[in-house]
Curated annotation (Swiss-Prot):
It comes from the Eukaryota. One of its GO terms (molecular function) is scavenger receptor activity. The lineage of its organism: Eukaryota, Metazoa, Ecdysozoa, Arthropoda, Hexapoda. Keywords: Cell membrane, Glycoprotein, Membrane, Transmembrane, Transmembrane helix. It comes from Drosophila melanogaster. This is Protein peste. InterPro entries: CD36_fam. Belongs to the CD36 family. (Microbial infection) Plays a role in mycobacterial infection. Mediates infection by M.fortuitum and uptake of M.smegmatis. It is found in: Cell membrane.
Amino acid sequence: MTSRTRHCARLGIVLLGICCIASGIYLFRNWIDMFTRMRGQEMALSPNSRSFEGWKVSPLPLDFDIYLFNWTNPDDFYVGSNKKPHFEQLGPYRFREKPDKVDIEWHNHNASVSFHKKSWFYFDAAGSNGSLWDKVTTVNSVAHSAARRAAVDWFARTGVNIANKLYRQGVTITKTVDEMLFKGYEHPFISVGKLLRPQDVPYKRIGYHYPRNGSSEFDGDINMFTGADDIAKMGQIHTWNNLTHTGAFEGTCGQVHGSMGEFFPPNLGTKDTVYMYMPKMCRAIPLDYVETVTVHGVTAYKFSGTRHAVDNGTLYPDTRCYCVGGKCMPSGVINIGPCSFNASVYMSFPHFYMADPSYLEAIEGLRPEREKHEFFMALEPNAGVPMDVGGGFQANYYMEPIPGITLYENVPTVMIPMMWCEERVRVSEEIAADIALVPLIVLLGQIVTGILLAGGLICTCWYPTRQVTHFCHSDPKAKASVLRPLNAFGVNSSAATAPVAQLFRNNISSSGNERVGVRLLDYNRDSGIRLESGTMESSHRERLISEDSPDVVVR
């Protein structure tokens, strides 16, 4: 191989190293974004995408557990009884939910899809603790709501007092679990209300989940982004019932945003907050990162509802807009009256978990526990896919005395717990295995980036270093052959030999003024190489380099 060929090969190695370093730096800065774009093209929701069927009809079994609070001492509910309302929890009453998306319409102009959610609920007797025929006593919310509306007018108050006696209304009502939940029950005040003001009473019956079973209107019309133009927007709500602001709460509290629960933004971090939109609350619930967990071997970030999620300005100023009509309750409950025909209904975490202690102090029978009552979502951070979801919310009724209404003039002010629901879904091991590929691909990209950077550094730095090392350890004749031709190009050979002479000088001067024995190489044009040995005084050393000779003499 000629010297020119060797030179070109060496130059090629260095250039290859530079290219590897540049590629490694580019991947280091852009790999996550590149992978997100590639995955977005594959995962964006469309009629032909892989995610469509799983989104339309969930492939996972969905357990919907309902717990009811049975009021055991309603006869002692009056001012001066010195007895707190006592409740016992009944359930769970488990239902298997079969959800479906219907009335699907695609909107390519803004990469969104509109749909209605339709769910069927089937009672699971084997998984339940009780039957649908169990009796439960709870607050008569319809009668109290009618009394609240009539409180400002004397004629209305008189009419409500007469109706309460005529229809034998009490502070509480007792029904079967089936009637309380999906079947519903008839109430005389609802029948009268439909005759007087039908626009305010859209239903014939009342029940906690009536008429949710088999209804496509219960959650309203939902429009969400598909992620076709931006994968980070996939699954995020755009409008609810054609609204971007519900009007239920002022300012940002009434904005429509967040996820419906199927998709969340990718590339999540521990500082992020995710939002889940709750149609029946007319608001989004913030979930904050709490810990890193493992689900079927896949690392996931657990986001949970904190005190911030159920505050109304008591603890966090930014949540003050959840106060309705200037009335702010102690932290821990959410007023959903604007979403529930202005009923005095409040939502909280089960058993008033993370709520102000005053709610628990006013009643008996409830005991909040994080393991049982936490609302959480474990999300795979790279893809934003839910791995494990659990928890729910509790419905409460705010009971207060109403002057002029005989039935409610002497009742204490108490937040009455009625029921709470828990949805639990966890991905199967097969689905988890597919999801596990996402972090592996991300890791693979990082490994390739490291290999490119390391290989580039080796090619760029190792070869020149090897050449210098080889030169320093070569024999004197080889060094002379390298240095001598420099004169032909007008280069002062003394400058070229200076590093070698400096090396000799350093080796000698390291002994101070002591007499040292050294073996010196004297380069000579005629003889080629001459070895001189001697002993000399280091303080009298001097290097002489002839202008017409590359000989180095040390004396």
